Amino acid sequence: MNVSYMAHVKGKVQGVYFRASSQQVAIEYSLSGYARNLTDGDVEVLMCGEEHNIEKMIKWLEQGPPEAEVENVDVKQVPWQEHHFFAIS
């Protein structure tokens, strides 16, 4: 069953290839959605796809790429959103 989740990632997550790395992992897990920088220095990640793959993506978000220092990941389920790819914005 396809579902959508939104993650708000706090910490040192901008300027460390967090969005690009998120895109690579999302593609690996067959997820669509997006990763975008927020003005407060955090990153927002929308993940759409099979729930077991989203769970894997969330585990990755809790660590991030090597240069990142993730402090917190707040995740909530959101209404299904149809996306055909994983975008960086």
What is each of the regions a protein language model found here?
Residues 1-89:
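Intrinsically disordered, low-complexity, mixed-charge
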